[in-house]
């Protein structure tokens, strides 16, 4: 009997054993919080890694680790278990306009690039109208020869359209 697992972060039901996935998944982001004990964030990271392992072993899917952290103390363990990884994912959503979050994201990028010797690419979930700030944040990775990929997504496209409409209103 095939196993079923409801993957709410993807809004779909995956039945393993019947299909071979040729897709890439980014591991879920079980939001880490800055105002809780560190063990809770470590547990959330572990849950995300468990789902990634399940997708990889049971569904034959390639799962890209999502790097998440709440504060500087989380940077200690964000690369645990990832030494042989060549691709990771970051989100800049909500971190561009806040100086503290922006600086923390920049430190996280540096930590990941320095800690993962086999890293070749970073996929960035970004919702800004242009990639100017993201390019600055990931400039350290680019300087080390890491390919930084910032694909379009629905929210980014919506923000681009809204910014063009706002520009046209004032033209």
Model-derived regions: residue spans:
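Eukaryote-skewed repeat-based solenoidal scaffolds used as protein-protein interaction platforms
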Residues: 2-158
């Amino acid at each position: 009997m095939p196993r079923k697992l409801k993957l709410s972060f993807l809004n779909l039901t995956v039945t393993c054993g019947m299909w071979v996935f040729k897709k890439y998944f980014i591991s879920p982001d079980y939001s880490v919080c800055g105002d809780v004990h560190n063990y809770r964030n470590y547990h959330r990271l572990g849950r995300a890694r468990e789902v990634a392992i399940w997708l990889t072993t049971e569904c034959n899917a390639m799962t890209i680790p999502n790097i998440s952290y709440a504060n500087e103390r989380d940077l200690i363990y964000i690369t645990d278990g990832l030494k042989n990884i060549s691709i990771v994912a970051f989100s800049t959503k909500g971190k561009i306009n806040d100086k503290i979050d922006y600086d923390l994201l920049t430190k996280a990028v540096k930590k990941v690039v320095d800690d993962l010797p086999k890293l070749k690419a970073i996929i960035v979930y970004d919702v800004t109208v242009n990639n100017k700030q993201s390019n600055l944040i990931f400039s350290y990775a680019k300087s080390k020869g890491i390919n930084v990929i910032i694909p379009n997504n629905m929210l980014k496209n919506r923000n681009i359209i809204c910014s063009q409409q706002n520009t046209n209103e004032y033209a």
